[in-house]
């Protein structure tokens, strides 16, 4: 949720953010109206409750002759209070709906526009232009690493098995990411992958893209698409001690996405699948520290990308492609030779106070007063990275060189085609 103080004092800033995202600025006026209506209803109800309390006291001290009219008035006030409290509930519901409809206010400097309006911040390494390169699926099958056919037989399209050294490659990648996180002060976690609806709402995943989420019918739970969700809910309703700096967590989990809006996109291989594994960094900090923490998360992602030795670029994602919770997002995209394009391997988002406000996560400032915390998240490794590793390290004979950092996990320096 956005900050109501900002909304009331500078609604134009919120309107500009909405326009940069390509979203409706009229939602800002709708929230202002709902906010004013809610406050008016609360004021009326409070006045009636005070009058009812005074009337009740006067009845107790009245003489028998004075009591009948006072009792009638007390009864009238009780009915009015009941009606006013019903109005409060209705006004609160309308206000909450209007509040939830507005995306986070973007950070200054975020490019306006949609998916193609990003800004390139850095390019690392030279893209490889191989003669007749094989794609990751052809390589994965010939090397005995990926089995899409049996994945589809067991579970349907966009499912797969990682087998043999394919499984070791992914496990090694995730262990490498977790070690990097722990070495930098992250607390390792293996979180639940089924969460309550209020946690999904709190993180912003039941908004415009709710159709991407798997729901477990009958249990009222949702499968997460990232461990950002349970980690954001981890401290919901709590007051944190941030006096010694940010709290950092690394979540290792399976992730699930319906890919409902991706019909016909990336149907080959493991670029876009329904289930994958990921190590996600998550940070709680003060709002003043959020931008610095965002840069640090990006730095750790870049360290991981250096370890898998692939060319990549860093982009500043445009406002219309941020998602509702992020105020700014950096993506790292690796070069994929067979596509002749960069594809996303990591995202890191500064969600400012948007998620924490929804989830009632606070900290105490220097004076001891509770304030809304800031939250950030960032990918440290995921299954899709295998695509970049296989394609960028393939050799003319069909083998693939294992990046040096992953050799201890995989057990060989070169992945050879299986008979």
UniProtKB/Swiss-Prot annotation:
CDD domains: SerRS_core. The gene is serS. L-serine binds at residues 226-228, 280, 379. This is Serine--tRNA ligase. It catalyses: tRNA(Ser) + L-serine + ATP = L-seryl-tRNA(Ser) + AMP + diphosphate + H(+); tRNA(Sec) + L-serine + ATP = L-seryl-tRNA(Sec) + AMP + diphosphate + H(+). It comes from Mycobacterium tuberculosis (strain ATCC 25618 / H37Rv). The keyword Cell inner membrane does not apply. Its main location: cytoplasm. GO terms for molecular function: ATP binding; serine-tRNA ligase activity; tRNA binding. HAMAP family: Ser_tRNA_synth_type1 (MF_00176). ATP binds at residues 257-259, 273, 344-347. GO terms for cellular component: cytoplasm; plasma membrane.
């Amino acid at each position: 949720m956005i900050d109501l103080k900002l909304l009331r004092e500078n609604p134009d800033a919120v309107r500009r953010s909405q326009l940069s995202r390509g979203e409706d600025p009229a939602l800002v006026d709708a929230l202002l109206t709902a906010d004013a209506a809610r406050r008016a209803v609360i004021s009326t109800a409070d006045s009636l409750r005070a009058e009812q309390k005074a009337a009740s006291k006067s009845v107790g001290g009245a003489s028998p002759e004075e009591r009948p009219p006072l009792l009638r008035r007390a009864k009238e006030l009780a009915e009015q209070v009941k009606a006013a409290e019903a109005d409060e509930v209705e006004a609160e519901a309308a206000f909450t709906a209007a509040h939830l409809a507005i995306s986070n206010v973007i950070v200054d400097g975020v490019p306006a526009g949609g998916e193609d309006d990003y800004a390139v911040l850095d390019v690392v390494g030279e893209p490889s232009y191989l003669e007749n390169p094989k794609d990751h699926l052809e390589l994965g099958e010939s090397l005995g690493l990926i089995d899409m056919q049996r994945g589809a037989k067991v579970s349907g399209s966009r499912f797969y098995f990682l087998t043999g050294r394919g499984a070791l490659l992914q496990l090694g990648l995730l262990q490498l990411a977790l070690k990097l996180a722990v070495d930098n002060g992250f607390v390792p976690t293996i979180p639940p992958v089924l969460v309550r609806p209020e946690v999904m709402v709190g993180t912003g995943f039941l908004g415009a893209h709710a159709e991407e989420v798997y729901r477990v019918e009958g249990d009222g739970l949702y499968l997460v698409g990232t461990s950002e969700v349970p980690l954001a809910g981890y401290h919901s309703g709590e007051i944190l001690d941030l006096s010694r700096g940010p709290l950092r967590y690394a979540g290792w989990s399976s992730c699930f996405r319906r890919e409902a809006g991706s019909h016909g996109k990336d149907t080959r291989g493991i670029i876009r699948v329904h289930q994958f594994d990921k190590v996600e960094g998550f940070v709680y900090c003060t709002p003043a520290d959020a931008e610095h923490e965002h840069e640090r998360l990006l730095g750790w992602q870049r360290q991981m990308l250096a370890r898998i030795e692939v060319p990549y670029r860093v982009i500043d994602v445009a406002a219309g492609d941020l998602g509702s919770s992020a105020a700014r997002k950096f993506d790292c995209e690796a070069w994929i030779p067979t596509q002749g394009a960069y594809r996303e391997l990591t995202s890191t988002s500064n969600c400012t106070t948007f998620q924490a406000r929804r989830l009632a996560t606070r900290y105490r400032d220097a004076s001891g007063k509770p304030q809304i915390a800031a939250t950030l998240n960032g990918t440290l490794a995921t299954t899709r990275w295998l695509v970049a590793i296989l394609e960028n390290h393939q050799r003319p004979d069909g083998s693939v060189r294992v990046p040096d950092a992953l050799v201890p996990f995989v057990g060989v320096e070169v992945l050879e085609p299986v008979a």
